[in-house]
């Protein structure tokens, strides 16, 4: 007989270790503006293309199940002047149809290289050792902006023999470092008549106003104006040649962060609990119980009663499941003014992260949790 108790997850202290370390940080920190915001219009553009990877060691697409691979290969060969007879059934195992994606950065110029991601779209077993053939990469306007080609680097590993196989990470995708060459630039317009818009990464009136104050102190009143909780309007030089120097100084200005919104993030699937340093709790009383599941399994053997017959010995599992829930005692949670005190108070409950899901929700409903509760 084997006994397998299903214990709950470890205590909150292990889950909230990263959150507790944040308590040692200062209440307000100054960061560079470039880490908090981006200039409107300065962004990357997504590119996509369809291509073929060749040179695989028998791990390519099975063309009977992926006819588009054979069709693509036939079309490519015809462009190279090679005619494949109609109705030919090429049983190739070293070719795979793939989708190629890349991000064209802002201000990219012809001749610049970018990384590409290669992903199998058929039933290829592995792209290891393959070479991507010349693949046009198009943007949303269906125009070609880059050409990709090169050897695919696959991060996974695997082997199979005798019907058994082992695999580490995925083998159906890889990357080509500097695998695409930019052929056409994307027009980038971010300054008109000296006006530039700065977009904060997070919507916060306090931080946005602090950024405007820092800019106005450096360049004079009226240089920055808050449009809303996320957008700043900047008045820069009218001469386009002076705009890069102006924006470079803007990016490196230190900005004091406003206190963040108190928030607790709970992952209901994994039991992870993360909270920021502005979370506080009021005094409350909490009672919780522990749930345990015990499974007992015993194999019983049944043999035929009459010897020398066609009866067979049968092994039948006998499984018993027992659920136990221990009563919880009412415990007092004291008022906590900072993250370290919050973690200490919740640890004193002895609750597991799974129990903490219900406890935090109940504390929020009772008004004892001074934070926004978000369950993902």
From Swiss-Prot:
Location of this chain's protein in the cell: Periplasm; Bacterial flagellum basal body
One GO term describing the cellular component: outer membrane-bounded periplasmic space
Residues annotated as signal peptide: 1-29
Alphabetical keyword list: Bacterial flagellum, Periplasm, Signal
GO molecular function, one term: structural molecule activity
Main location: periplasm
Any coiled-coil regions, as ranges: none
This protein's record includes keyword Hydrolase: no
Highest taxon, organism lineage: Bacteria
GO BP of this protein: bacterial-type flagellum-dependent cell motility
Pfam families recorded: FlgI
Family annotation (InterPro entries): Flag_FlgI (IPR001782)
Family: Belongs to the FlgI family.
Entry function: Assembles around the rod to form the L-ring and probably protects the motor/basal body from shearing forces during rotation.
Listed NCBIfam families: PRK05303.1
HAMAP family: FlgI (MF_00416)
Subunit and interaction comment: The basal body constitutes a major portion of the flagellar organelle and consists of four rings (L,P,S, and M) mounted on a central rod.
Protein's UniProt name: Flagellar P-ring protein
Organism: Bordetella avium (strain 197N)
Lineage: Bacteria, Pseudomonadati, Pseudomonadota, Betaproteobacteria, Burkholderiales
């Amino acid at each position: 007989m084997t006994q397998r108790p299903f214990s709950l997850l470890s205590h909150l202290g292990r889950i909230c270790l990263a959150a507790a370390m944040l308590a040692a940080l200062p209440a307000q920190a100054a960061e560079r503006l470039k880490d908090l915001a981006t200039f409107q219009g300065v962004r990357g553009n997504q590119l996509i293309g369809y291509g073929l990877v060749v040179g695989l060691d028998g791990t390519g697409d099975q063309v009977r199940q992926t006819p588009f691979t054979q069709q693509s290969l036939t079309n490519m060969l015809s462009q190279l002047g090679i005619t494949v007879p109609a109705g030919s059934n090429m049983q190739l195992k070293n070719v795979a149809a793939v989708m190629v994606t890349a991000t064209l950065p802002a201000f990219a110029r012809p001749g610049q290289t970018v990384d590409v991601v290669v992903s199998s779209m058929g039933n290829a077993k592995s792209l290891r050792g393959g070479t991507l053939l010349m693949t046009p990469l198009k943007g949303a306007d269906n125009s070609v902006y880059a050409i990709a080609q090169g050897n695919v680097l696959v991060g996974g590993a695997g082997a199979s023999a005798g019907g058994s196989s082992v695999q580490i990470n995925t083998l159906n995708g890889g990357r080509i470092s500097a695998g695409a060459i930019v052929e056409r630039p994307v027009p980038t317009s971010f300054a008109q008549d000296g006006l530039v818009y700065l977009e904060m990464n997070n919507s916060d009136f306090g931080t946005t106003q602090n950024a405007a104050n820092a800019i106005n102190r450096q360049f004079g009143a009226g240089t920055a104006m808050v449009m809303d909780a996320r957008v700043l309007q900047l008045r820069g030089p009218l001469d386009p040649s002076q705009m890069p120097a102006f924006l470079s100084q803007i990016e490196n200005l230190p900005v004091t962060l406003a206190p963040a919104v108190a928030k607790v993030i709970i992952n209901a699937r994994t039991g992870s609990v993360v909270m920021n340093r502005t979370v506080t709790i009021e005094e409350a009383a909490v009672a919780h119980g522990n749930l345990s599941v015990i499974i007992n399994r015993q194999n019983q053997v049944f043999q035929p009663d009459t010897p020398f017959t066609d009866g067979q010995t049968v092994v039948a599992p006998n499984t018993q499941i027992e659920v136990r829930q221990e009563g919880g005692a009412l415990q007092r949670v004291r008022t906590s003014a900072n993250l370290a005190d919050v973690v200490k108070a919740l640890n004193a409950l002895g609750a597991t992260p799974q129990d903490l899901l219900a406890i935090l929700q109940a504390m929020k409903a009772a008004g004892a949790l001074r934070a926004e509760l978000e369950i993902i």
